[in-house]
């Protein structure tokens, strides 16, 4: 999983305290370095921790969360350096995984108008310099409404769209311009000179921090008259200029995509921010769409929803279609489900292919035709093209009133996931450091909607025996796997999980639990030869680990002769045979001279349950 490094995960003392707090705005408000922290809030026992009269940022203060007594960092708190080093080592896989990825980020108008915007932009600048490519799409709805109110005018909405008269268009131009200038200014400063003076390149001390490029990166057209309503200068996305956006990203710039579009006749049109952002994410084949909002996605009990599969998000939106215009428009846009809706978890899940040249991506489909999103055209479902659905617009009175919570943002997330963007993150921007916590903390800090997590993974069935045998036979013949007869394989079938793609078994693995010892054996991880190098083995191992955790197991072990390196890279450590449960030791074929490896499982709080897949 890529949700992020688990910083400060042990029960020992730690200064990186955000990970020891409940995920609520009230707790995170205390992470301002100016505030004194109450040691009784910590969730660990620190025999050496004592309240101090003054608290300042430590020299290892990566995210402004570390605190220590002034002047006593090295003498009394040597654990700080250890935690700092540990954080970097644990974050390394995620730093590596995100580098070179393209994230489209929507920053809502409410967040831009609030006090948390500066910190979010600092984090974006930090991530940009780590090699993440950003397209920023700022919201302007609140700012436009405020400008109209100051001029004695009232905003008019019909459905998801604003009716843009001359006054509204002028306000939209002013709001977009002011926000663009502000974002460019906030992203321009480099890192603090005092922090880089020792090791930094002195010739770069006064360089501009982040280069921001903006311009006419998409073509628009008038929405026109719909159901008798003249929307004036309201625009819809016609086509994203993928080549120019990618050129700027390749050149090391952050692309700022405003909601002002330009028509073929030279008009300026006021477009919907979410429509622009979702259309851009689909067209350029973004790795993520990140929506920074002014609140969290909560369940009926008021708890944060950490994770939703595409099926679950789609189902939640569809259930509200009778009471929500935005949900109804989602159903209208993507269809009733017969064309591209995933089958139930026990059946075959379709295949999601990656974007090609940033212009076309496919999503889950049934039958012989895989629906395709094509920039500037729409979705081709095999029965003709869907016009005008370049992106998904949300807004209007429904979004402003929040009668349906953040259902509109969830609908947009499901829309782009169905179009091929594999991950969408819905984040509460009022939480300090939420972007870093979401990307570098294993369980995240927001709600992730994903189309690719455990795609096609399920428990094995009797009809899968032939497919499993086909995959493991070459590995048995080479001595990598222990030979199993058909009878042995059938008896162990309940312990197998498989990955199915287009009706074919492409990977398998087994988990044999030993409940008395609270551990389980991982066995028979195998991937079809033509599907290797696609991460299927990692997906299966992650699935096995989550399944083991759900069964109450605390450790996993395995026996291997030739694949030790693969498992060591995934957290397994060599152990003695005495660590293996007695009942399993009695059945070990010592003539194979296998090596034994063990891995302790970290309690999983990501919200991703294999029982839901």
UniProtKB/Swiss-Prot annotation:
Pathway annotation: Amino-acid biosynthesis; L-arginine biosynthesis; N(2)-acetyl-L-ornithine from L-glutamate: step 1/4
UniProt KW keywords: Acyltransferase, Amino-acid biosynthesis, Arginine biosynthesis, Chloroplast, Plastid, Transferase, Transit peptide
Transit peptide (residue range): 1-74
Catalytic activity: L-glutamate + acetyl-CoA = N-acetyl-L-glutamate + CoA + H(+)
One matching Pfam family: Acetyltransf_1
GO cellular component: chloroplast
Signal peptide: none
GO annotation terms (biological process): L-arginine biosynthetic process
Family statement drawn from the similarity comment of this UniProt entry: Belongs to the acetyltransferase family. ArgA subfamily.
Protein name, UniProt field: Probable amino-acid acetyltransferase NAGS2, chloroplastic
């Amino acid at each position: 999983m890529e949700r992020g490094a688990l910083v400060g995960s042990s029960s020992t003392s730690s200064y990186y305290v955000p990970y020891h707090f409940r995920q609520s705005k009230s707790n995170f408000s205390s992470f301002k370095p100016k505030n004194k922290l109450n040691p009784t809030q910590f969730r660990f026992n620190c025999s050496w921790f004592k309240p101090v009269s003054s608290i300042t940022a430590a020299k290892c203060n990566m995210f402004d969360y570390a605190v220590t007594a002034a002047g006593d960092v090295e003498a009394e708190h040597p654990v700080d350096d250890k935690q700092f080093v540990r954080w970097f080592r644990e974050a390394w896989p995620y730093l590596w995984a995100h580098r070179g990825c393209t994230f489209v980020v929507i920053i809502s108008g409410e967040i831009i108008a609030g006090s948390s915007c500066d910190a979010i932009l600092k984090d974006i600048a930090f991530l940009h310099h780590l090699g993440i490519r950003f397209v920023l799409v700022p919201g302007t709805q609140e700012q436009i409404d405020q400008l109209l109110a100051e001029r004695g005018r009232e905003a008019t909405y019909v459905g998801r769209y604003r009716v843009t008269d001359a006054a509204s268009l002028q306000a939209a131009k002013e709001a977009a311009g002011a926000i663009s200038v502000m974002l460019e200014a906030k992203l321009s400063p480099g890192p603090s000179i005092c922090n880089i003076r020792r090791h930094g390149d002195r010739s770069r001390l006064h360089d501009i921090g982040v280069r921001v490029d903006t311009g006419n990166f998409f073509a628009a057209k008038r929405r026109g008259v719909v159901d008798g309503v003249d929307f004036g200068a309201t625009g819809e996305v016609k086509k994203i200029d993928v080549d120019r956006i990618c050129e700027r990203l390749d050149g090391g710039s952050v692309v700022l995509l405003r909601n002002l579009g330009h028509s073929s006749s030279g008009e300026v049109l006021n477009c919907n921010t979410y429509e622009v952002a979702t259309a851009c994410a689909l067209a350029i084949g973004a790795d993520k769409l990140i929506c920074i909002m002014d609140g969290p996605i909560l369940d009926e009990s008021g708890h944060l929803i950490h994770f939703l599969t595409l099926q679950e998000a789609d189902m939640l939106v569809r259930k509200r279609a009778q009471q929500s215009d935005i949900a109804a428009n989602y159903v209208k846009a993507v269809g009733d489900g017969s064309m591209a809706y995933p089958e139930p978890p026990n059946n075959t899940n379709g295949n999601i292919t990656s974007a090609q040249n940033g212009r076309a991506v496919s999503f889950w489909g049934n039958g012989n035709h895989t629906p395709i999103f094509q920039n500037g055209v729409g979705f081709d479902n095999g029965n003709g093209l869907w016009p005008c659905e370049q992106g998904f617009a949300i807004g209007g009175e429904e979004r402003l009133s929040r009668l349906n919570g953040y259902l509109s943002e969830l609908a947009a997330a499901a829309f782009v996931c169905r179009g091929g963007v594999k991950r969408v993150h819905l984040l509460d921007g009022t939480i300090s450091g939420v972007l870093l916590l979401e990307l570098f903390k294993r369980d995240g800090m927001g709600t992730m909607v994903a189309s690719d997590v455990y795609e096609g993974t399920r428990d094995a069935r009797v009809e899968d025996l032939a497919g499993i045998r086909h995959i493991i036979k070459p590995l048995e013949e080479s001595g990598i796997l222990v030979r199993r007869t058909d009878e042995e394989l059938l008896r162990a079938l309940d312990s197998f999980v498989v990955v199915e793609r287009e009706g074919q078994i492409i990977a398998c693995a087994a988990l044999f639990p030993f409940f008395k010892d609270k551990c389980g054996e991982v066995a028979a991880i195998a991937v079809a030869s033509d599907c290797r190098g696609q991460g299927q083995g990692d997906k299966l191992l992650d699935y096995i680990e989550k399944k083991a955790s759900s069964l109450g197991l605390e450790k996993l072990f395995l026996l291997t002769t030739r694949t030790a390196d693969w498992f060591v890279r995934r957290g397994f450590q060599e152990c003695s045979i005495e660590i293996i449960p007695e009942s399993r030791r009695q059945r070990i074929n010592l003539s194979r001279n296998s090596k034994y490896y063990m891995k302790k499982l970290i309690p999983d709080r990501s919200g991703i349950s294999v029982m839901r897949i």
